[in-house]
Amino acid sequence: MSEQANKEMVRRYVRYLKLQRNMSGNTLDAYQRDLRKLLDYLEGEGKDPCEVQLEDLEQFSAGLHDIGIHARSQCRILSGVRSFFRFLQLDGYRDDDPTELLESPQIGQHLPEVLTTAEVDRLEASIDLSKWEGHRNRAIIEVLFSCGLRVSELTNLKLSNLYLDEQFIRVMGKGSKERLVPISKKAIQELGFWFDDRQHMDIKPGEEDYVFLNRRGAHLTRVMILIMIKRQAEAAGIQKTISPHTLRHSFATALLEGGADLRVIQALLGHESIGTTEIYTHIDTSTLRREILEHHPRNMKR
Protein backbone atom coordinates (compact mmCIF):
# COMPACT_ATOMS: atom_id res chain seq x y z
CA MET A 1 0.00 0.00 0.00
CA SER A 2 1.31 3.45 -0.92
CA GLU A 3 2.08 6.13 1.63
CA GLN A 4 -0.87 8.16 0.38
CA ALA A 5 -3.19 5.16 0.73
CA ASN A 6 -1.93 4.60 4.27
CA LYS A 7 -2.64 8.22 5.16
CA GLU A 8 -6.17 7.90 3.76
CA MET A 9 -6.70 4.71 5.78
CA VAL A 10 -5.63 6.46 8.99
CA ARG A 11 -7.80 9.47 8.14
CA ARG A 12 -10.83 7.19 7.73
CA TYR A 13 -10.02 5.48 11.04
CA VAL A 14 -9.85 8.80 12.89
CA ARG A 15 -13.17 9.81 11.33
CA TYR A 16 -14.63 6.47 12.48
CA LEU A 17 -13.46 7.13 16.05
CA LYS A 18 -15.04 10.57 16.01
CA LEU A 19 -18.39 9.64 14.49
CA GLN A 20 -18.98 6.00 15.42
CA ARG A 21 -17.18 5.84 18.75
CA ASN A 22 -18.01 9.43 19.73
CA MET A 23 -14.55 9.98 21.22
CA SER A 24 -13.58 13.19 22.96
CA GLY A 25 -10.61 15.25 21.82
CA ASN A 26 -8.18 14.02 24.49
CA THR A 27 -9.09 10.36 24.03
CA LEU A 28 -8.84 10.72 20.28
CA ASP A 29 -5.39 12.29 20.59
CA ALA A 30 -4.24 9.40 22.81
CA TYR A 31 -5.50 6.81 20.31
CA GLN A 32 -3.67 8.57 17.48
CA ARG A 33 -0.40 8.76 19.46
CA ASP A 34 -0.58 5.06 20.28
CA LEU A 35 -1.44 4.19 16.68
CA ARG A 36 1.59 6.17 15.52
CA LYS A 37 3.80 3.98 17.74
CA LEU A 38 2.50 0.91 15.95
CA LEU A 39 2.70 2.38 12.44
CA ASP A 40 6.27 3.63 12.98
CA TYR A 41 7.25 0.18 14.22
CA LEU A 42 5.64 -1.55 11.23
CA GLU A 43 7.26 0.88 8.81
CA GLY A 44 10.66 0.10 10.32
CA GLU A 45 9.96 -3.61 9.88
CA GLY A 46 8.77 -3.13 6.30
CA LYS A 47 5.27 -4.36 7.14
CA ASP A 48 1.97 -3.15 5.69
CA PRO A 49 -0.93 -2.87 8.19
CA CYS A 50 -3.15 -4.73 5.73
CA GLU A 51 -0.76 -7.71 5.70
CA VAL A 52 0.30 -7.82 9.36
CA GLN A 53 -0.03 -11.15 11.15
CA LEU A 54 -0.45 -12.01 14.82
CA GLU A 55 3.28 -12.75 15.14
CA ASP A 56 4.14 -9.20 14.06
CA LEU A 57 1.87 -7.73 16.72
CA GLU A 58 3.29 -10.06 19.35
CA GLN A 59 6.75 -8.75 18.51
CA PHE A 60 5.49 -5.18 18.87
CA SER A 61 3.93 -6.06 22.23
CA ALA A 62 7.13 -7.78 23.38
CA GLY A 63 9.06 -4.63 22.50
CA LEU A 64 6.84 -2.56 24.80
CA HIS A 65 7.61 -4.96 27.64
CA ASP A 66 11.33 -5.04 26.84
CA ILE A 67 11.77 -1.32 27.34
CA GLY A 68 9.99 -1.42 30.70
CA ILE A 69 6.62 0.10 29.83
CA HIS A 70 4.16 -0.50 32.66
CA ALA A 71 1.53 -3.17 32.12
CA ARG A 72 -1.31 -0.65 32.33
CA SER A 73 0.25 1.47 29.57
CA GLN A 74 0.88 -1.65 27.48
CA CYS A 75 -2.80 -2.58 27.83
CA ARG A 76 -3.87 0.91 26.75
CA ILE A 77 -1.65 0.82 23.66
CA LEU A 78 -2.79 -2.68 22.69
CA SER A 79 -6.42 -1.66 23.18
CA GLY A 80 -5.88 1.01 20.54
CA VAL A 81 -4.18 -1.54 18.27
CA ARG A 82 -7.22 -3.83 18.53
CA SER A 83 -9.54 -0.94 17.75
CA PHE A 84 -7.52 -0.10 14.63
CA PHE A 85 -7.55 -3.63 13.22
CA ARG A 86 -11.25 -4.09 13.99
CA PHE A 87 -11.84 -0.96 11.92
CA LEU A 88 -9.68 -2.30 9.07
CA GLN A 89 -11.85 -5.41 8.99
CA LEU A 90 -15.12 -3.45 9.21
CA ASP A 91 -14.05 -1.06 6.46
CA GLY A 92 -12.96 -3.81 4.09
CA TYR A 93 -9.19 -3.25 4.26
CA ARG A 94 -8.75 -6.74 5.68
CA ASP A 95 -10.72 -9.99 5.72
CA ASP A 96 -9.54 -10.89 9.20
CA ASP A 97 -8.60 -9.34 12.54
CA PRO A 98 -5.05 -10.37 13.56
CA THR A 99 -5.59 -9.09 17.11
CA GLU A 100 -8.24 -11.70 18.02
CA LEU A 101 -5.65 -13.87 19.77
CA LEU A 102 -3.36 -11.02 20.87
CA GLU A 103 -2.92 -11.21 24.63
CA SER A 104 -2.50 -8.23 26.94
CA PRO A 105 -0.17 -8.33 29.95
CA GLN A 106 -1.58 -8.92 33.40
CA ILE A 107 -2.13 -5.58 35.12
CA GLY A 108 -0.65 -6.99 38.28
CA GLN A 109 2.63 -8.07 36.70
CA HIS A 110 5.69 -6.52 38.29
CA LEU A 111 7.63 -3.88 36.43
CA PRO A 112 10.05 -1.39 37.94
CA GLU A 113 8.80 1.93 39.24
CA VAL A 114 9.06 4.92 36.92
CA LEU A 115 9.89 8.48 37.93
CA THR A 116 8.32 11.52 36.33
CA THR A 117 10.57 14.32 35.13
CA ALA A 118 9.43 16.37 38.13
CA GLU A 119 10.49 13.56 40.48
CA VAL A 120 13.91 13.36 38.81
CA ASP A 121 14.22 17.11 39.34
CA ARG A 122 13.34 16.63 43.03
CA LEU A 123 15.92 13.87 43.29
CA GLU A 124 18.62 16.15 41.91
CA ALA A 125 17.50 19.15 43.96
CA SER A 126 17.86 17.12 47.16
CA ILE A 127 21.62 16.76 46.63
CA ASP A 128 23.85 18.86 48.88
CA LEU A 129 26.22 20.59 46.46
CA SER A 130 28.43 21.80 49.30
CA LYS A 131 29.73 18.24 49.71
CA TRP A 132 32.59 17.04 47.51
CA GLU A 133 30.40 14.37 45.87
CA GLY A 134 27.44 16.69 45.25
CA HIS A 135 28.10 17.55 41.62
CA ARG A 136 29.21 13.97 40.93
CA ASN A 137 25.93 12.56 42.23
CA ARG A 138 23.85 15.06 40.30
CA ALA A 139 25.76 14.20 37.11
CA ILE A 140 25.21 10.48 37.74
CA ILE A 141 21.45 10.89 38.08
CA GLU A 142 21.21 13.16 35.06
CA VAL A 143 23.26 10.86 32.82
CA LEU A 144 21.17 7.85 33.85
CA PHE A 145 17.93 9.69 33.11
CA SER A 146 19.09 11.47 29.94
CA CYS A 147 20.89 8.50 28.38
CA GLY A 148 19.11 5.43 29.77
CA LEU A 149 22.30 3.60 30.76
CA ARG A 150 22.51 0.40 32.74
CA VAL A 151 24.30 0.98 36.04
CA SER A 152 27.18 -1.26 34.88
CA GLU A 153 27.52 0.90 31.76
CA LEU A 154 27.69 4.00 33.92
CA THR A 155 30.36 2.64 36.26
CA ASN A 156 32.48 1.66 33.25
CA LEU A 157 31.98 4.93 31.37
CA LYS A 158 35.34 6.42 30.36
CA LEU A 159 36.43 9.95 29.54
CA SER A 160 37.58 8.56 26.19
CA ASN A 161 33.96 7.46 25.56
CA LEU A 162 32.68 11.04 25.68
CA TYR A 163 32.13 13.08 22.53
CA LEU A 164 30.51 16.05 24.21
CA ASP A 165 31.08 18.50 21.36
CA GLU A 166 29.03 16.15 19.17
CA GLN A 167 26.62 15.44 22.07
CA PHE A 168 27.16 11.67 21.98
CA ILE A 169 28.66 9.09 24.32
CA ARG A 170 29.96 5.65 23.37
CA VAL A 171 28.55 2.95 25.63
CA MET A 172 29.90 -0.56 26.12
CA GLY A 173 26.82 -2.71 26.67
CA LYS A 174 26.10 -6.36 27.32
CA GLY A 175 28.25 -8.80 25.41
CA SER A 176 30.85 -6.07 24.82
CA LYS A 177 28.59 -4.49 22.19
CA GLU A 178 29.10 -0.78 21.65
CA ARG A 179 26.42 1.76 20.86
CA LEU A 180 26.29 5.54 20.49
CA VAL A 181 23.77 7.38 22.65
CA PRO A 182 22.91 11.10 22.40
CA ILE A 183 23.48 13.06 25.62
CA SER A 184 21.41 16.09 26.63
CA LYS A 185 22.82 19.56 27.17
CA LYS A 186 21.74 19.38 30.81
CA ALA A 187 23.70 16.17 31.33
CA ILE A 188 26.73 17.76 29.66
CA GLN A 189 26.38 20.76 31.97
CA GLU A 190 26.23 18.55 35.07
CA LEU A 191 29.28 16.61 33.88
CA GLY A 192 31.12 19.91 33.46
CA PHE A 193 30.45 20.85 37.09
CA TRP A 194 31.68 17.42 38.20
CA PHE A 195 34.82 17.67 36.06
CA ASP A 196 35.67 20.99 37.74
CA ASP A 197 35.73 19.12 41.07
CA ARG A 198 37.30 15.96 39.67
CA GLN A 199 40.42 17.72 38.43
CA HIS A 200 41.44 18.46 42.03
CA MET A 201 41.31 14.78 43.10
CA ASP A 202 44.16 12.37 43.66
CA ILE A 203 43.33 9.58 41.23
CA LYS A 204 44.68 6.05 41.59
CA PRO A 205 46.94 4.74 38.81
CA GLY A 206 44.88 2.95 36.18
CA GLU A 207 41.68 4.79 37.15
CA GLU A 208 42.39 8.04 35.31
CA ASP A 209 40.00 7.38 32.42
CA TYR A 210 36.90 6.55 34.50
CA VAL A 211 34.30 9.33 34.52
CA PHE A 212 32.89 8.73 38.00
CA LEU A 213 35.21 8.23 40.98
CA ASN A 214 34.87 7.71 44.72
CA ARG A 215 36.67 9.81 47.31
CA ARG A 216 39.69 7.47 47.13
CA GLY A 217 40.14 8.15 43.43
CA ALA A 218 38.86 4.78 42.19
CA HIS A 219 35.88 4.10 39.93
CA LEU A 220 32.50 3.55 41.53
CA THR A 221 30.77 0.21 42.00
CA ARG A 222 27.14 -0.59 41.26
CA VAL A 223 26.40 -0.90 44.97
CA MET A 224 27.77 2.59 45.66
CA ILE A 225 25.43 4.08 43.08
CA LEU A 226 22.45 2.07 44.35
CA ILE A 227 23.01 3.29 47.92
CA MET A 228 23.43 6.90 46.76
CA ILE A 229 20.20 6.89 44.75
CA LYS A 230 18.18 5.30 47.55
CA ARG A 231 19.50 7.90 50.01
CA GLN A 232 18.65 10.75 47.66
CA ALA A 233 15.15 9.36 47.09
CA GLU A 234 14.60 9.38 50.84
CA ALA A 235 15.98 12.92 51.10
CA ALA A 236 13.69 14.03 48.27
CA GLY A 237 10.64 12.49 49.93
CA ILE A 238 10.03 10.09 47.04
CA GLN A 239 8.02 7.15 48.36
CA LYS A 240 8.62 4.84 45.40
CA THR A 241 11.10 1.97 45.69
CA ILE A 242 13.76 3.02 43.21
CA SER A 243 17.18 1.98 41.98
CA PRO A 244 19.52 3.03 39.16
CA HIS A 245 17.43 0.84 36.85
CA THR A 246 14.40 2.99 37.68
CA LEU A 247 16.04 5.91 35.88
CA ARG A 248 16.68 3.71 32.83
CA HIS A 249 13.01 2.73 32.70
CA SER A 250 12.02 6.35 33.28
CA PHE A 251 14.14 7.32 30.26
CA ALA A 252 12.38 4.75 28.08
CA THR A 253 8.91 5.63 29.35
CA ALA A 254 9.47 9.36 28.85
CA LEU A 255 10.52 8.75 25.26
CA LEU A 256 7.63 6.42 24.45
CA GLU A 257 5.02 8.66 26.05
CA GLY A 258 6.61 11.59 24.21
CA GLY A 259 6.01 9.85 20.89
CA ALA A 260 9.41 8.32 20.08
CA ASP A 261 9.70 5.32 17.77
CA LEU A 262 9.77 2.00 19.66
CA ARG A 263 12.65 0.67 17.56
CA VAL A 264 14.74 3.75 18.29
CA ILE A 265 14.12 3.39 22.04
CA GLN A 266 15.24 -0.24 21.87
CA ALA A 267 18.38 0.83 20.03
CA LEU A 268 19.14 3.54 22.59
CA LEU A 269 18.74 1.00 25.40
CA GLY A 270 21.02 -1.49 23.66
CA HIS A 271 18.32 -4.16 23.38
CA GLU A 272 18.29 -7.02 20.93
CA SER A 273 14.73 -8.11 21.51
CA ILE A 274 12.41 -10.14 19.32
CA GLY A 275 12.42 -8.72 15.81
CA THR A 276 15.03 -6.06 16.53
CA THR A 277 18.31 -7.97 16.09
CA GLU A 278 20.97 -5.85 14.39
CA ILE A 279 18.74 -2.82 14.75
CA TYR A 280 21.65 -0.49 14.04
CA THR A 281 21.69 -1.66 10.45
CA HIS A 282 18.38 0.22 10.09
CA ILE A 283 18.83 3.25 12.36
CA ASP A 284 21.61 5.78 11.95
CA THR A 285 22.94 8.21 14.56
CA SER A 286 21.12 11.18 13.07
CA THR A 287 17.82 9.38 13.64
CA LEU A 288 18.77 8.62 17.24
CA ARG A 289 19.64 12.25 17.88
CA ARG A 290 16.44 13.51 16.26
CA GLU A 291 14.26 11.19 18.36
CA ILE A 292 16.00 12.28 21.58
CA LEU A 293 15.71 15.97 20.70
CA GLU A 294 12.05 15.70 19.77
CA HIS A 295 10.74 13.33 22.42
CA HIS A 296 12.85 13.33 25.62
CA PRO A 297 11.72 15.87 28.25
CA ARG A 298 15.29 17.06 28.84
CA ASN A 299 15.40 18.32 25.26
CA MET A 300 11.81 19.25 24.41
CA LYS A 301 10.99 22.94 24.42
CA ARG A 302 8.63 23.83 27.22
Regions found by a protein language model. Name each.
Residues 1-302:
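Conserved catalytic core of the tyrosine transesterase superfamily
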